[in-house]
Structure formats: structure tokens, C-alpha cells
Amino acid sequence: MGREPEMEEARENGGVGGSVLPLASLISPTGNEVQISELEGKIIGLYFAANWYPKCEAFTPALTAAYHQLKEHGAGFEVIFVSCDENRPSFERFHRAMPWPAVPFGDIGCKKRLSERFQVEGIPRLVVLAPNGEVVQPDAVELVHRYGDRAFPFTSARVAELEADEQRKFASQTLEKIFSVSGKDYVNGSQEQVPISSLVGKTVGLYFSAHRCAPCIKFTAKLAAIYSNLKGKAEDFEIIYIPMDKEEDGYLRSCSDMPWLALPYDDGASSGALARYFDVREIPTLVVVGPDGKTVTREGRNLVNLYFDMAFPFTDEQIRLLQEMEDEDAKGYPPSLRHTGHRHELSIVSDKSGGGPYICCECDEQGLGWAYQCIACGYEIHLRCGRDMEGRAE
């Protein structure tokens, strides 16, 4: 990575404390002064974030966990919060949930200079600096999400090492190895414990979800219908609920709504380990593991929304077949139509002519590629929804 002029300036002026953070002190989460001299010799993470942005709220716990682990191991690492909050109460509320110091909220000039110097255009952003002020990683958010404290010291060599380890891990993956990460060798059935070994050779969906989650509730109903259809066809398919519930009551309520197996509840330790293993960032998420124990897809939710039970067994070959069928079916649709839900004429598009991922404005379900679209307004519907509506209007 090239050494920017400001990093050279940092070295000439005493490293991180001398130039990159040109202020007398920082403040702790409790409001006490923190001396810049305490940063000397440490790798620094400048954390640009704001209380109002959900992605920052989601990332802060991950960074906090990595921070505590590194502190316990005596790593020379410090994080500095650079707030993008709009008012002091929001800043103070967010900072109190962090274990590291921050640039004082009122030091607007410093925050502006840091944002401009590191070209911060979006949050969350974690700029990692070496003790001499050189940029090690322009944005380590993804690394912390994927690897936690193992990403330290965030160098290119360390990232390459982690990626190689990950490739070896997935290459030798089996269903039993996956669940060894969680510390469990069984899951709960309706009446009994089911050994993981009994599921080897099946296509298994790992369903990360929670009870108090509106998107999860909606998707669970759809997934349950598809699960029932596949079971009726005697397909070798099983789903395991991986609870992301914060309380056992929510877990039990979720289990009562689901016809499949469930990972035992243990305050989130087992589920968290599996979520980290598969880099799960949001729920609901459906990870599909094939009969050989290898990951087929982490996009099971999208595939179910797009293709319903026809997505099974979720392989690339099956999805290509479905896409070819869609291409053929599209030939039977008119090139344009008038839809009662929109004032403009809609034109047919594909992923090769302006189409892409979308949410159907008629049925609120996901779509991909083929659609009826209003280019002026961005209004899009499934081809089938356009045909159905036109049929009802006649």
C-alpha cells in the first residue's frame, strides 16, 4: 500500500498522536480526559460511526467483542470513535456503549479534517493505522465482521493468511464439522434429540431467524409451506432452526411455529458460533448445505423467494435450469402492458436489458431479472403479476 503524504507528515511529527489526531486529548465513555500519549506505539482504529444508523449499531458489538479479546491478550490496539452524530445527547448515548475513547463531540474541526483526510463517504468505517501513522487498512469493517479479533494486526499478509485458512476450512467441511463449531452433536426434534450424524447425506438448510423479527415471521410461513411440499415429495431435505433469539421464551415461541429441527438454546453461544462461521449479517438467512457437507449457497432465502420449492436442491445447476425456463416463459408475455397499479405503461425487461434484483410492487415479493418496469418511476412487477392483473381487468 502506498504511503500517503499525510502519513509521512505523521511520522515527522511523532506518529499518530502528533499529526493524524492533532488535539490535546480524547474523552473516555464516562467523559474523562484521555491523554494522546496513551496511544503511542499502538495500532489505532479510527471508528467513524453514528448512533442513528442501524449498520453502525450492528457493527459496534462485533468491534467491541474483538476489542475486548485483543485487550485480554495484551495486543497494542486502540479504537477512537469519530462521531457522525447530529447532536450531543446521541453522541453521548452511543459512546457510553463503547469501551474506547472518542474525539470530543464539540471538536468539529478535528472530525472534519479526519473525515476529509481518510475520504470517509460512508459509515460505519474503520480506518486502521500503524503506530507510525501509516494506513494499514482503509476500511476494516468487513474484516472484523468476518474474522473478529483474529484480523489483528489487519495487514495484507494477515488477511491473506486468514483467507487461505478459510478456503481450507470450507474445502474440508462436513455437516458434523460444521456443528462441532457450535459444540453440539445433536439438534432437537419435536419429541427427541436427533444426532447430527443421522442428517449426513441430506440437503440441510440452516435457518438463522428469531421470534421478534417481522421479516423472519413472513419468511418462516413461506419456508414452512415449501418444507411441507418437499417432504410430501419425499425429498431428502431437512431444516435446522439456528436461533438468534436473545431470550429462551422467544426461542420456544419460534420452535412452536416451525415444523423442523432446532439447535438447542444456550444463550446464543452455539448460534453465534455458527453465525460467525457462515458470516451471517442479517436475519432471516438460509444457508444450504449439500449431501456432501459442503456449502451449496448462503442465499437460500433469496432462492426460496424467487423460485419457491423449485429451487431445491439449490445447486448452481438447478438455478441455471430455472433461469433458462424463465427465459423461455418470457417469450409468451407481451412486450408492454398497462397495469392498474401504475399510471404509466410498463415495458418488459431482463437482466440483460436493465432488469435486476427488485421487490414486486404488486405482491411485495422478491424478483430478479425479468420484470415489467416503468423506467421513469422505477415501478417494477413480476411478469406473472402483470399478466394476472391484466387478466382481472378485462
Swiss-Prot record:
PANTHER family the UniProt entry points to: NUCLEOREDOXIN 2-RELATED, THIOREDOXIN
EC number: 1.8.1.8
Keyword NAD: yes
PROSITE patterns: THIOREDOXIN_2
Domain Thioredoxin: 15-176, 180-327
UniProt-listed InterPro entries: C1-like_sf, DC1, Nucleoredoxin-like, Thioredoxin-like_fold, Thioredoxin-like_sf, Thioredoxin_domain
Protein name listed in UniProt: Probable nucleoredoxin 2
